[in-house]
Amino acid sequence: KKPGLVVHEDDDNTPDTLIHRILHYLYNKGEYRPEEENSFVPALCNRIDRNTGGIVIAAKNAAALRILNQKIKDRELSKKYLCLVHGVLQPKAATLKDYLVKDGEQNRVRVFHQPVPNGKTIITSYKTLKTNGQISLLEVDLKTGRTHQIRAHLAFYGHPLVGDTKYGTNAMNKGNTHRYQALYAYKLRFDFSTDAGILSYLNGKEFTVDHVSFADEI
């Protein structure tokens, strides 16, 4: 999906959503018949933020949804992200482990080095692909999948995403031309260690978005 598109209806009852587009597409192909009694409604298996672009998985039938949800839970699918951050990370590649707490009132999360009440462990691996000394392009692998994890975790270490007004600073974003934070779920791989039934044909397959616009800015 493109940045700016919500995956599901939100509190504003946004009519244009990713799932609505998917249902419309499948209806036109004759693969979704809402008028039929007990018809399965295709559903999303994962979500990404409104302002994040990238690969999202949808299931067209109940069996696929059940299998994919279990595979995601068992971490038999891997997703990688590209992002632009302020500054140069040292070391160039590392795995960060900290704790995250959701702040519902502020619609944001907070990160801590030590365990805190209601805190959940977050693990984020990153690798610097290139840098110009002021901004860096990273490939990020989430070992845990928490709300705003990449954005908040990297900002916690002093390297917020370019264009991120929630976790960045006004000074860093001065002169920014990005409408959304520079974050994209660009790679998905299926590595099944157990039987996947009707989806076994996906095992070992990898899907990659060939061109992410902000990756060319360095």
Model-derived regions, located:
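Hydrophobic residues embedded in beta-strands of well-ordered beta-sheets
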Residues: N107-V109, S136
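RNA pseudouridine synthases
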Residues: K1-G104, P117, A215-E217
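Intrinsic-disorder/low-complexity, polar/charged segments enriched in Ser/Thr/Lys/Arg/Asp/Glu/Gln
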Residues: S78-K80, T95, T121-I123, I135-L137, ...
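Short, well-ordered beta-strand segments enriched in hydrophobic/aromatic residues
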Residues: K1, L138-D141
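A structural micro-motif recognizing beta-strand termini
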Residues: H86, V140-K143
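Beta-strand-connecting loop/turn residues
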Residues: G53, G133-Q134
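Pseudouridine synthases involved in rRNA/tRNA modification
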Residues: V116-I123, T128-G133, K143, T147, ...
